Curated annotation (Swiss-Prot):
Coiled-coil blocks: none
Pfam families linked to this entry: Mur_ligase_C, Mur_ligase_M, MurD_N
Reactions that this protein is recorded to catalyse: UDP-N-acetyl-alpha-D-muramoyl-L-alanine + D-glutamate + ATP = UDP-N-acetyl-alpha-D-muramoyl-L-alanyl-D-glutamate + ADP + phosphate + H(+)
Record-stated family: Belongs to the MurCDEF family.
Protein name: UDP-N-acetylmuramoylalanine--D-glutamate ligase
Keywords: ATP-binding, Cell cycle, Cell division, Cell shape, Cell wall biogenesis/degradation, Cytoplasm, Ligase, Nucleotide-binding, Peptidoglycan synthesis
Species of provenance: Salinibacter ruber (strain DSM 13855 / M31)
Subcellular location: Cytoplasm
Length: 460
Protein backbone atom coordinates (compact mmCIF):
# COMPACT_ATOMS: atom_id res chain seq x y z
CA UNK A 1 0.00 0.00 0.00
CA UNK A 2 1.41 3.41 -0.95
CA UNK A 3 1.35 6.46 1.35
CA UNK A 4 -1.31 8.02 -0.89
CA UNK A 5 -3.47 4.92 -0.51
CA UNK A 6 -3.03 5.01 3.27
CA UNK A 7 -4.27 8.60 3.34
CA UNK A 8 -7.47 7.45 1.63
CA UNK A 9 -7.91 4.48 3.97
CA UNK A 10 -9.62 3.89 7.29
CA UNK A 11 -7.45 1.46 9.23
CA UNK A 12 -8.25 -0.39 12.42
CA UNK A 13 -5.24 -1.39 14.47
CA UNK A 14 -5.97 -4.45 16.61
CA UNK A 15 -3.92 -4.58 19.80
CA UNK A 16 -3.02 -1.77 22.16
CA UNK A 17 0.41 -2.94 23.28
CA UNK A 18 3.63 -1.25 22.20
CA UNK A 19 3.69 -2.36 18.55
CA UNK A 20 -0.02 -1.71 18.02
CA UNK A 21 0.21 1.80 19.41
CA UNK A 22 3.29 2.46 17.28
CA UNK A 23 1.46 1.32 14.13
CA UNK A 24 -1.53 3.52 14.97
CA UNK A 25 0.69 6.57 15.50
CA UNK A 26 2.51 5.90 12.23
CA UNK A 27 -0.64 5.56 10.14
CA UNK A 28 -2.13 8.68 11.72
CA UNK A 29 1.07 10.65 11.17
CA UNK A 30 1.06 9.94 7.42
CA UNK A 31 -2.56 11.08 7.18
CA UNK A 32 -4.61 7.93 7.59
CA UNK A 33 -7.87 7.68 9.52
CA UNK A 34 -7.02 5.33 12.36
CA UNK A 35 -9.02 3.48 15.02
CA UNK A 36 -7.34 1.29 17.64
CA UNK A 37 -9.18 -1.52 19.41
CA UNK A 38 -7.89 -3.45 22.42
CA UNK A 39 -9.50 -6.27 24.39
CA UNK A 40 -7.95 -5.27 27.71
CA UNK A 41 -7.76 -2.08 29.75
CA UNK A 42 -5.23 0.55 28.65
CA UNK A 43 -1.78 0.67 30.17
CA UNK A 44 -0.70 3.84 31.94
CA UNK A 45 -0.45 6.75 29.53
CA UNK A 46 -1.70 4.82 26.50
CA UNK A 47 -4.94 6.75 26.01
CA UNK A 48 -3.24 10.14 26.38
CA UNK A 49 -0.59 9.19 23.82
CA UNK A 50 -3.25 8.08 21.34
CA UNK A 51 -5.20 11.30 21.90
CA UNK A 52 -2.08 13.30 21.16
CA UNK A 53 -1.51 11.31 17.95
CA UNK A 54 -5.09 11.86 16.78
CA UNK A 55 -6.02 8.19 17.00
CA UNK A 56 -9.53 7.13 17.98
CA UNK A 57 -9.66 4.08 20.22
CA UNK A 58 -11.57 1.66 22.38
CA UNK A 59 -10.32 -0.44 25.27
CA UNK A 60 -12.00 -3.26 27.16
CA UNK A 61 -13.41 -5.10 24.14
CA UNK A 62 -14.01 -4.99 20.40
CA UNK A 63 -17.18 -3.33 19.13
CA UNK A 64 -18.71 -3.15 15.67
CA UNK A 65 -16.85 0.11 15.09
CA UNK A 66 -13.61 -1.85 14.85
CA UNK A 67 -14.87 -3.53 11.68
CA UNK A 68 -15.92 -0.24 10.09
CA UNK A 69 -12.61 -0.13 8.25
CA UNK A 70 -10.90 -0.81 4.96
CA UNK A 71 -7.96 -2.67 6.48
CA UNK A 72 -6.88 -4.24 9.76
CA UNK A 73 -3.32 -3.93 11.04
CA UNK A 74 -2.42 -6.47 13.72
CA UNK A 75 -0.13 -6.09 16.67
CA UNK A 76 2.08 -9.22 16.86
CA UNK A 77 0.27 -10.50 19.94
CA UNK A 78 -3.05 -10.82 18.08
CA UNK A 79 -3.50 -14.29 16.54
CA UNK A 80 -5.28 -14.93 13.27
CA UNK A 81 -7.70 -17.18 15.20
CA UNK A 82 -9.06 -14.29 17.28
CA UNK A 83 -12.72 -13.48 16.71
CA UNK A 84 -12.17 -9.97 15.42
CA UNK A 85 -9.62 -11.09 12.82
CA UNK A 86 -11.86 -13.92 11.68
CA UNK A 87 -14.78 -11.51 11.34
CA UNK A 88 -12.64 -9.14 9.31
CA UNK A 89 -11.50 -11.90 6.99
CA UNK A 90 -15.07 -13.09 6.47
CA UNK A 91 -16.04 -9.49 5.65
CA UNK A 92 -13.33 -9.34 3.00
CA UNK A 93 -11.10 -6.82 4.78
CA UNK A 94 -7.39 -6.82 4.07
CA UNK A 95 -5.37 -7.85 7.13
CA UNK A 96 -1.73 -6.84 7.56
CA UNK A 97 0.93 -7.22 10.21
CA UNK A 98 2.58 -4.22 11.86
CA UNK A 99 5.88 -5.06 10.12
CA UNK A 100 4.11 -5.08 6.76
CA UNK A 101 2.46 -1.71 7.38
CA UNK A 102 5.70 -0.08 8.53
CA UNK A 103 7.58 -1.39 5.50
CA UNK A 104 5.36 0.69 3.20
CA UNK A 105 7.23 3.79 4.41
CA UNK A 106 10.79 2.46 4.57
CA UNK A 107 13.34 4.15 2.32
CA UNK A 108 16.31 2.10 3.54
CA UNK A 109 17.36 -1.47 2.70
CA UNK A 110 16.23 -4.00 5.29
CA UNK A 111 18.18 -6.90 6.76
CA UNK A 112 15.45 -9.08 8.32
CA UNK A 113 16.36 -11.89 10.71
CA UNK A 114 14.19 -14.75 11.97
CA UNK A 115 14.51 -18.22 13.45
CA UNK A 116 13.13 -20.10 16.42
CA UNK A 117 16.30 -19.43 18.40
CA UNK A 118 19.10 -16.92 18.06
CA UNK A 119 17.29 -14.13 16.26
CA UNK A 120 17.68 -11.52 19.00
CA UNK A 121 21.39 -12.21 19.41
CA UNK A 122 21.94 -12.22 15.65
CA UNK A 123 19.95 -9.01 15.21
CA UNK A 124 21.91 -7.27 17.96
CA UNK A 125 25.22 -8.53 16.58
CA UNK A 126 24.36 -7.56 13.00
CA UNK A 127 23.28 -4.12 14.16
CA UNK A 128 26.56 -3.81 16.06
CA UNK A 129 28.51 -4.60 12.87
CA UNK A 130 26.67 -1.95 10.86
CA UNK A 131 26.94 0.64 13.62
CA UNK A 132 30.66 0.03 13.81
CA UNK A 133 30.89 0.37 10.03
CA UNK A 134 28.94 3.64 10.02
CA UNK A 135 30.58 5.16 13.12
CA UNK A 136 32.68 7.60 11.11
CA UNK A 137 30.16 8.17 8.31
CA UNK A 138 28.17 11.35 8.76
CA UNK A 139 24.44 10.95 8.15
CA UNK A 140 24.42 7.16 7.81
CA UNK A 141 22.64 5.14 10.48
CA UNK A 142 22.00 1.51 11.40
CA UNK A 143 18.47 1.23 12.80
CA UNK A 144 17.81 -1.89 14.90
CA UNK A 145 14.13 -2.60 15.52
CA UNK A 146 11.32 -5.15 15.39
CA UNK A 147 10.77 -8.01 17.80
CA UNK A 148 13.89 -6.96 19.68
CA UNK A 149 11.73 -4.49 21.62
CA UNK A 150 11.67 -1.42 19.38
CA UNK A 151 8.67 -1.37 17.02
CA UNK A 152 9.60 -0.79 13.38
CA UNK A 153 6.70 1.66 13.13
CA UNK A 154 8.38 3.98 15.65
CA UNK A 155 11.49 4.43 13.50
CA UNK A 156 10.56 3.91 9.88
CA UNK A 157 9.84 7.55 9.04
CA UNK A 158 13.37 8.42 10.15
CA UNK A 159 14.99 6.15 7.57
CA UNK A 160 17.07 7.45 4.68
CA UNK A 161 18.10 5.49 1.58
CA UNK A 162 21.70 5.42 2.83
CA UNK A 163 20.74 3.82 6.16
CA UNK A 164 20.39 0.11 6.91
CA UNK A 165 17.47 -1.26 8.94
CA UNK A 166 18.20 -4.45 10.87
CA UNK A 167 14.94 -6.11 11.93
CA UNK A 168 14.28 -9.02 14.22
CA UNK A 169 11.05 -10.57 12.96
CA UNK A 170 9.07 -13.30 14.71
CA UNK A 171 6.69 -15.75 13.09
CA UNK A 172 3.83 -13.65 14.50
CA UNK A 173 5.12 -10.58 12.68
CA UNK A 174 5.50 -12.56 9.46
CA UNK A 175 1.86 -13.60 9.48
CA UNK A 176 -0.11 -11.36 7.12
CA UNK A 177 2.76 -9.91 5.09
CA UNK A 178 1.95 -9.08 1.48
CA UNK A 179 4.72 -6.85 0.12
CA UNK A 180 7.36 -6.91 2.90
CA UNK A 181 10.64 -7.35 1.01
CA UNK A 182 13.98 -7.28 2.81
CA UNK A 183 17.17 -6.77 0.81
CA UNK A 184 18.70 -9.52 2.95
CA UNK A 185 16.65 -12.20 4.72
CA UNK A 186 18.22 -14.44 7.36
CA UNK A 187 16.66 -17.74 8.44
CA UNK A 188 18.62 -19.31 11.28
CA UNK A 189 16.66 -22.42 12.29
CA UNK A 190 13.15 -23.78 12.72
CA UNK A 191 12.17 -26.03 15.61
CA UNK A 192 8.77 -26.51 17.31
CA UNK A 193 7.70 -23.46 19.33
CA UNK A 194 4.59 -21.28 19.65
CA UNK A 195 2.59 -24.09 18.04
CA UNK A 196 -0.57 -23.13 19.92
CA UNK A 197 -0.70 -20.05 17.70
CA UNK A 198 -0.69 -22.34 14.64
CA UNK A 199 -3.22 -24.97 15.73
CA UNK A 200 -0.31 -27.21 16.74
CA UNK A 201 0.70 -27.49 13.08
CA UNK A 202 4.48 -27.33 12.70
CA UNK A 203 4.22 -26.84 8.94
CA UNK A 204 2.04 -23.76 9.44
CA UNK A 205 4.60 -22.36 11.87
CA UNK A 206 7.43 -23.09 9.45
CA UNK A 207 5.53 -21.44 6.60
CA UNK A 208 5.21 -18.27 8.66
CA UNK A 209 8.99 -18.26 9.02
CA UNK A 210 9.38 -18.83 5.28
CA UNK A 211 7.40 -15.65 4.66
CA UNK A 212 10.59 -13.74 5.36
CA UNK A 213 11.73 -14.39 1.78
CA UNK A 214 8.29 -14.68 0.20
CA UNK A 215 8.57 -11.39 -1.71
CA UNK A 216 12.28 -11.35 -2.43
CA UNK A 217 13.55 -11.37 -5.99
CA UNK A 218 16.44 -10.37 -8.23
CA UNK A 219 19.05 -8.38 -6.35
CA UNK A 220 18.05 -9.75 -2.93
CA UNK A 221 19.94 -12.22 -0.74
CA UNK A 222 18.77 -15.05 1.51
CA UNK A 223 21.21 -16.13 4.24
CA UNK A 224 20.24 -19.57 5.51
CA UNK A 225 21.42 -22.34 7.80
CA UNK A 226 22.45 -25.17 5.48
CA UNK A 227 22.60 -27.58 8.43
CA UNK A 228 18.86 -27.27 9.13
CA UNK A 229 16.96 -29.41 6.62
CA UNK A 230 13.73 -27.41 6.62
CA UNK A 231 15.57 -24.11 6.34
CA UNK A 232 17.84 -25.37 3.56
CA UNK A 233 15.03 -26.83 1.47
CA UNK A 234 12.80 -23.76 1.74
CA UNK A 235 15.56 -21.23 1.15
CA UNK A 236 17.09 -23.02 -1.81
CA UNK A 237 13.66 -23.49 -3.39
CA UNK A 238 12.90 -19.79 -3.00
CA UNK A 239 16.28 -18.85 -4.41
CA UNK A 240 15.76 -21.01 -7.48
CA UNK A 241 12.18 -19.90 -8.15
CA UNK A 242 12.51 -16.21 -7.29
CA UNK A 243 16.02 -15.38 -8.47
CA UNK A 244 17.24 -14.64 -4.94
CA UNK A 245 20.97 -14.97 -4.29
CA UNK A 246 21.51 -17.79 -1.76
CA UNK A 247 24.20 -17.53 0.92
CA UNK A 248 24.61 -20.57 3.16
CA UNK A 249 26.06 -20.71 6.66
CA UNK A 250 27.35 -24.02 7.97
CA UNK A 251 29.61 -25.59 10.55
CA UNK A 252 30.54 -28.29 8.04
CA UNK A 253 33.24 -26.87 5.77
CA UNK A 254 32.87 -23.83 3.53
CA UNK A 255 29.83 -23.54 1.21
CA UNK A 256 29.95 -22.52 -2.44
CA UNK A 257 28.56 -19.14 -1.34
CA UNK A 258 28.25 -17.94 2.24
CA UNK A 259 30.39 -18.73 5.28
CA UNK A 260 31.76 -21.67 7.19
CA UNK A 261 34.84 -22.97 8.97
CA UNK A 262 38.17 -24.33 7.78
CA UNK A 263 41.13 -25.23 9.98
CA UNK A 264 39.67 -23.38 12.94
CA UNK A 265 39.02 -20.17 11.03
CA UNK A 266 35.89 -18.45 9.72
CA UNK A 267 35.95 -18.33 5.94
CA UNK A 268 33.68 -16.04 3.91
CA UNK A 269 32.93 -16.80 0.28
CA UNK A 270 30.70 -14.05 -1.11
CA UNK A 271 32.36 -13.20 -4.44
CA UNK A 272 33.72 -16.54 -5.67
CA UNK A 273 36.83 -16.01 -3.55
CA UNK A 274 37.66 -17.24 -0.07
CA UNK A 275 38.31 -14.64 2.62
CA UNK A 276 39.87 -16.09 5.77
CA UNK A 277 38.17 -13.76 8.20
CA UNK A 278 39.37 -14.67 11.70
CA UNK A 279 40.13 -17.54 14.08
CA UNK A 280 37.01 -19.21 15.41
CA UNK A 281 38.25 -18.91 18.99
CA UNK A 282 38.28 -15.09 18.71
CA UNK A 283 34.48 -14.93 18.45
CA UNK A 284 33.04 -13.04 21.40
CA UNK A 285 30.01 -15.33 21.70
CA UNK A 286 30.37 -18.86 23.05
CA UNK A 287 28.58 -22.00 21.92
CA UNK A 288 27.67 -23.88 18.78
CA UNK A 289 24.51 -21.87 18.13
CA UNK A 290 26.45 -18.64 18.34
CA UNK A 291 28.74 -19.88 15.59
CA UNK A 292 25.71 -19.78 13.30
CA UNK A 293 24.66 -16.40 14.67
CA UNK A 294 28.13 -14.97 14.07
CA UNK A 295 28.31 -16.39 10.55
CA UNK A 296 24.88 -14.95 9.72
CA UNK A 297 25.90 -11.50 10.91
CA UNK A 298 29.16 -11.68 8.98
CA UNK A 299 27.54 -12.70 5.69
CA UNK A 300 24.71 -10.17 6.04
CA UNK A 301 27.21 -7.37 6.56
CA UNK A 302 29.57 -8.52 3.83
CA UNK A 303 26.90 -8.67 1.12
CA UNK A 304 25.99 -5.11 2.14
CA UNK A 305 29.63 -4.16 1.46
CA UNK A 306 30.91 -3.86 5.02
CA UNK A 307 34.67 -4.41 5.03
CA UNK A 308 36.18 -7.55 6.54
CA UNK A 309 38.23 -5.69 9.14
CA UNK A 310 35.05 -4.08 10.52
CA UNK A 311 33.29 -7.45 10.64
CA UNK A 312 36.27 -9.01 12.39
CA UNK A 313 36.44 -6.23 14.98
CA UNK A 314 32.69 -6.44 15.61
CA UNK A 315 32.50 -10.22 15.99
CA UNK A 316 35.39 -10.27 18.45
CA UNK A 317 34.25 -7.26 20.51
CA UNK A 318 30.50 -7.84 20.83
CA UNK A 319 29.37 -7.91 24.46
CA UNK A 320 26.27 -10.07 24.05
CA UNK A 321 22.59 -9.62 24.87
CA UNK A 322 20.93 -9.67 28.32
CA UNK A 323 19.17 -12.92 29.29
CA UNK A 324 20.93 -14.94 26.56
CA UNK A 325 23.83 -16.89 28.08
CA UNK A 326 24.57 -13.74 30.05
CA UNK A 327 27.46 -14.29 32.44
CA UNK A 328 26.32 -12.56 35.62
CA UNK A 329 29.09 -13.16 38.17
CA UNK A 330 31.59 -15.73 39.37
CA UNK A 331 31.17 -16.48 43.08
CA UNK A 332 33.49 -18.94 44.88
CA UNK A 333 34.76 -20.11 41.47
CA UNK A 334 31.20 -20.90 40.29
CA UNK A 335 29.98 -19.05 37.18
CA UNK A 336 26.33 -17.93 37.29
CA UNK A 337 24.70 -17.60 33.85
CA UNK A 338 21.33 -16.03 33.03
CA UNK A 339 19.73 -17.68 29.99
CA UNK A 340 16.15 -16.72 30.84
CA UNK A 341 15.36 -16.21 27.14
CA UNK A 342 15.72 -19.99 26.65
CA UNK A 343 11.97 -20.62 26.57
CA UNK A 344 12.06 -23.85 24.55
CA UNK A 345 13.90 -27.16 24.67
CA UNK A 346 16.09 -26.44 21.66
CA UNK A 347 17.43 -23.26 23.27
CA UNK A 348 18.37 -25.19 26.41
CA UNK A 349 20.14 -27.80 24.27
CA UNK A 350 22.28 -25.04 22.78
CA UNK A 351 22.96 -23.60 26.23
CA UNK A 352 24.11 -26.92 27.69
CA UNK A 353 26.27 -27.56 24.65
CA UNK A 354 28.02 -24.23 25.18
CA UNK A 355 29.90 -25.27 28.33
CA UNK A 356 32.69 -27.78 28.83
CA UNK A 357 32.38 -27.98 32.61
CA UNK A 358 29.75 -29.38 35.00
CA UNK A 359 26.43 -27.55 35.11
CA UNK A 360 23.78 -27.08 37.76
CA UNK A 361 20.66 -26.48 35.69
CA UNK A 362 17.70 -24.41 36.91
CA UNK A 363 14.76 -25.18 34.60
CA UNK A 364 10.99 -24.94 34.57
CA UNK A 365 8.15 -22.47 34.27
CA UNK A 366 4.97 -22.65 32.25
CA UNK A 367 5.20 -25.74 30.07
CA UNK A 368 4.75 -25.42 26.29
CA UNK A 369 4.13 -29.09 25.62
CA UNK A 370 7.84 -29.80 25.95
CA UNK A 371 9.41 -33.08 24.91
CA UNK A 372 12.70 -33.39 26.81
CA UNK A 373 13.98 -36.49 25.00
CA UNK A 374 16.73 -34.66 23.11
CA UNK A 375 18.04 -33.04 26.28
CA UNK A 376 18.51 -36.24 28.24
CA UNK A 377 21.91 -37.29 26.77
CA UNK A 378 23.35 -33.83 27.42
CA UNK A 379 21.97 -33.80 30.95
CA UNK A 380 23.54 -37.20 31.60
CA UNK A 381 26.91 -36.04 30.27
CA UNK A 382 27.12 -32.48 31.58
CA UNK A 383 24.67 -31.72 34.39
CA UNK A 384 25.63 -32.24 38.01
CA UNK A 385 22.19 -31.34 39.37
CA UNK A 386 18.76 -30.25 38.13
CA UNK A 387 16.75 -27.73 40.13
CA UNK A 388 13.14 -27.75 38.90
CA UNK A 389 11.12 -24.56 39.26
CA UNK A 390 7.61 -23.28 38.60
CA UNK A 391 4.39 -24.85 37.29
CA UNK A 392 6.27 -27.51 35.35
CA UNK A 393 8.63 -28.45 38.20
CA UNK A 394 7.14 -31.92 38.62
CA UNK A 395 7.53 -32.67 34.89
CA UNK A 396 11.05 -31.24 34.69
CA UNK A 397 12.15 -33.23 37.72
CA UNK A 398 10.52 -36.39 36.37
CA UNK A 399 11.92 -36.05 32.84
CA UNK A 400 15.39 -34.63 33.54
CA UNK A 401 16.11 -35.03 37.24
CA UNK A 402 16.80 -38.74 36.99
CA UNK A 403 19.38 -38.13 34.26
CA UNK A 404 21.59 -36.14 36.66
CA UNK A 405 23.37 -37.29 39.83
CA UNK A 406 21.21 -34.95 41.92
CA UNK A 407 17.87 -33.20 41.55
CA UNK A 408 15.48 -31.11 43.63
CA UNK A 409 12.43 -28.90 43.37
CA UNK A 410 12.08 -25.20 44.28
CA UNK A 411 9.08 -22.98 44.91
CA UNK A 412 10.78 -19.63 44.22
CA UNK A 413 13.79 -18.34 42.31
CA UNK A 414 15.49 -17.54 45.60
CA UNK A 415 14.97 -21.12 46.75
CA UNK A 416 16.19 -22.43 43.38
CA UNK A 417 19.37 -20.37 43.59
CA UNK A 418 20.02 -21.52 47.16
CA UNK A 419 19.69 -25.17 46.10
CA UNK A 420 21.85 -24.60 43.02
CA UNK A 421 24.56 -22.90 45.08
CA UNK A 422 24.52 -25.84 47.50
CA UNK A 423 24.87 -28.37 44.67
CA UNK A 424 27.59 -26.53 42.73
CA UNK A 425 31.29 -27.21 43.16
CA UNK A 426 34.23 -24.94 42.30
CA UNK A 427 34.62 -24.76 38.53
CA UNK A 428 30.92 -25.44 37.86
CA UNK A 429 28.31 -23.34 36.07
CA UNK A 430 24.92 -22.51 37.60
CA UNK A 431 22.72 -22.04 34.55
CA UNK A 432 19.21 -20.60 34.51
CA UNK A 433 17.89 -22.01 31.22
CA UNK A 434 14.20 -22.72 31.82
CA UNK A 435 12.91 -24.37 28.58
CA UNK A 436 9.55 -22.83 29.52
CA UNK A 437 7.78 -19.51 29.38
CA UNK A 438 7.89 -17.24 32.43
CA UNK A 439 4.19 -16.48 32.76
CA UNK A 440 3.55 -18.74 35.75
CA UNK A 441 5.64 -16.49 38.01
CA UNK A 442 6.71 -13.42 36.04
CA UNK A 443 5.46 -10.83 33.59
CA UNK A 444 8.04 -11.89 30.99
CA UNK A 445 11.39 -13.62 30.61
CA UNK A 446 13.18 -10.31 31.28
CA UNK A 447 11.67 -10.06 34.76
CA UNK A 448 12.63 -13.67 35.43
CA UNK A 449 16.20 -13.02 34.33
CA UNK A 450 16.41 -9.76 36.27
CA UNK A 451 15.29 -11.60 39.41
CA UNK A 452 17.97 -14.24 38.92
CA UNK A 453 20.62 -11.57 38.31
CA UNK A 454 19.60 -9.59 41.40
CA UNK A 455 19.70 -12.69 43.59
CA UNK A 456 23.12 -13.68 42.27
CA UNK A 457 24.42 -10.22 43.13
CA UNK A 458 23.39 -10.79 46.75
CA UNK A 459 25.88 -13.69 46.86
CA UNK A 460 28.84 -11.37 46.32
Amino acid sequence: MTPDEVRRTRATVVGGARSGRAAARLLAKVGGEVFLTEQDAPSDGAAAALDEAGVEYEFGGHTAEALDADVLVLSPGVPTQSNIVQQALRAGLDVYSEIEAASWFCDAPIVAITGTNGKTTTTSLTGHVFRTAFADTLGREAIVAGNIGYPFSDYVLETEPTDVVVLEVSSFQLDHVETFRPRVSVLLNITPDHLGRYDHDFEAYAQAKHNIFRNQGEGDVVVYNRDDDDVRNAAEEAAAEQGVRPMAITREGVPAAGAGFRDGRIVLRTDDEDDSLMPQDELALRGRHNMYNSLAAAVSARVMEVENDVIRESLSGFEGVPHRLEEVHTVDDVLYVNDSKATNVNAVWYALESFDRPIVLIAGGRDKGNDYTDLKPLVRDQVRAVVALGESAEKVERELGGEAPDHSRAETMEDALTQAQRAAQPGDVVLLSPACSSFDMYENYEERGDTFRRLVETLL
